[in-house]
Amino acid sequence: MTAERIAANRRPVGPVVRLAIACRIPSAAMARTSLGFAVIAAVWLSLGSARDDGVALVAAIALFVTVDAGRVLGQESSAPAVEWGLTACALLAELFVYAGMAAGVSLRTVSAAPSGPVGQMLRGTFIAGFGGAGTAGVWRLAVIAVMVAALVPMVGLCLHDPAATATAAGTRVFGPLGDVRLPVAVVAVLLAGVRAGFVVVLMLGVAALVATIIESIRPGWDPIEVRGYRGDGRISVWIGRFVDGRIPPMAPLFVGLLVTGSLTALGLRNLPGILVLTPVEAMLLASFGSWHPHGGRADWLVPPLIQAAEYVFLAEVGFADREWPPMTFALVAAAGFRHLDLAYRARSGLASGIDRRGLGWEGRMIVVGIAAATGGLVVVYPALTVYLWWLNLRDWTVGWAGQAGSARHPAVDG
């Protein structure tokens, strides 16, 4: 594809794309450059003044341009590793920016209340207390933003085959990871404060999810193989073996979500001792569907819903136990990164989708639940976070070295 044709696809970044092609800069280098701009934006966002936010806005715009240019350059390559590398860098960029937005409140250089020229008018509105009071409330919003950032690409993977994922409506209109959400969020921070920035991020993220889901109900859409995207661990696979795929995945998952959602809404802090494990036990019902082929029209919902339940449980346990909020942020981010890495490798035939080393969604929930019930969360939480990020780094560097088609799901090959 010529530079002119590539640039015509995305006119705002056309000059950057042409320059990158002329200088033979690959998409991976553009993605790594975007991470540098993300770190710059995060650092300046944490400092808090209007001038600092202005610098962060410039960095966020540069981040948007480099991510978008890298994505356009990546259209020339059909290699799954390139696609995952672009997605991973974009996800990490969002994590850095969200952490920087919340870190300023922890460092007391940024107010948790609405600020800026528009923020004064928002005091006394729902935005002023959105997410909860004080520093913990802001970090809660950051964690929710991470959940949305991880779920948007997962929904795209579950709905579309590789050729159609990049052109899904949600990414065309509202931007994929690392795209338009970040500069818009920084503008909101500059005008109305950190909470307003997260509100904008969440609104755009939810809009992208809704648009992508609406795209799935168009005539001619057919389900794709999503069993390997669930992120099951050994325990889930073992439980699913007993029913051998005869139980549809949505029914037991719905029961688990109902119990988990109800208890989370009531507050895990109010559950004494071993009752903290009740949401985990309820979600284990979803394991009965781990061997099912997931060929139903609604079965694509199963992986995102399982992962959303895991994220909510990990976050709520951390906040209920008053763990250090950045640690809760890091653990949820590690779990989200893990799920996406496994899903991309499963789609490429480089992994079965069974998360043996990462414990799986159910293993992580069990470990955190037991730690919360026994009072050991202060040790387990950081240990699990460090382990997952080490595993993510290891698998990102060596997990893509296998041969395509080398891994199968146990339900397929026994």
Predicted regions and their residues:
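Membrane-embedded alpha-helical segments that form the functional core of polytopic membrane enzymes
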Residues: A29-P80, A145, V199, P272-L284, ...
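Membrane interfacial helix-start motif at the N-side
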Residues: R18-I25
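Functional transmembrane alpha-helices
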Residues: S27, A60, A90-A93
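Membrane-interface alpha-helices at helix entry/exit sites of multi-pass transporters
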Residues: P80-A88
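The first (N-terminal) embedded transmembrane alpha-helix
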Residues: A28-F37, P249-L257
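A feature for the membrane-embedded catalytic helix bundles of lipid/isoprenoid biosynthetic enzymes
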Residues: M1-V16, T87-G414
